[in-house]
Structures are given as C-alpha cells and as structure tokens.
Amino acid sequence: NFIGMGYYGTYTPYVILRNILENPGWYTSYTPYQPEVAQGRLEMLLNFQQMIVDFTGMDIANASLLDEGTAAAEAVGLSHRLNKSDSNLVFVSENCHPQTIDVIQTRAEPMGLKVLVGNEDKALDNLKEDIVCGILQYPGTLGDIKDPSEAISKIHKRNGKAILACDLLALA
C-alpha cells in the first residue's frame, strides 16, 4: 500500500538505520576530514550513482544533493540553462510532494521563472506556449502509480525537459 507523501511501509535493516538514517553526518553539512571516512563516502556515492543509472537507464546520475526538493529545483535550473526558447514557464504536477513544489517555487522566482502547478492531464493539454520543463512525481504524492509516458510526451511537445521525482523502490 502506498500511503502517499513519500512515506511507504518498508523494512529498513538495522545496520542502514543506525549507520545512515540516524547518522547526522548524512543529513547535515558536516564534512568528514578523515581520509578513510571521506573515501568510504565517495565509494558509497559512486555506488548510489551506478544504482540510479541501472534503475533508470540514464547515461549519467548525480548523488550530491540531500533532498528531493533541492534536486528538483536544481533540475529546473539546469533545464532553464539548456532552454533554447524564450520560455520562462515551468510546469509542476500537482501530484508532486508539497515540499518539492514549495522549493521549486522559491528557487524559480530569482531565476525569473513562472511556475504553473496543475494537473498534468489537463494543464499540459491547455498550454499554448513552450515550457522550460515539466516535473512529475512517481509514485504521486497520494501514493498513486501512473504511467508518466503520456505526460512526458506532452512536455516534449512543448519543447520542455521532462523531470521525474521518483521513489527508488518504486523503480525496482
């Protein structure tokens, strides 16, 4: 059962719980100075990137961001820099997590981007202009599983980059 908002009933092994989830070094700005710890962290990040490439089929992946909202906002910024048109419109599915939408809206304003939050089925059909990008959530914030292929095609028809915020276990 996907209860939504990014929280799903999964079993977390104790060793992962204790050494990663409960270790403040992973979710604060703390930078380890011991070379052995730094090397271990680099190896873990490389393995994470490889797992993302394997799950998604993408050519490259990044592992330097700590939360989904920041990663989505960075993807919007990258899409904006790659954008060939004069568009400044970013589409965000209303099915994205609220915290992700908030971070995107906050980061888009200083870049001069307008954010349209809406239903991907209706809003993308009604758009008449190009967009910088479109952001979709998988599974959705209410826990629903939906094939994003049609929405991705609509985003591409508007010359936008498709960005997906995914739960890794849903891709496995």
Where are these regions (language model features)?
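Short, hydrophobic/aromatic alpha-helical segments in well-folded domains
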Residues: 48-51, 61, 75, 103
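Short loop-beta-helix segment that forms the pyridoxal 5′-phosphate
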Residues: 33-37, 54-73
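Conserved PLP-enzyme active-site core in the AAT-like
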Residues: 70-172
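Extended, polar/acidic
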Residues: 1-13, 56, 98-103, 110-111, ...
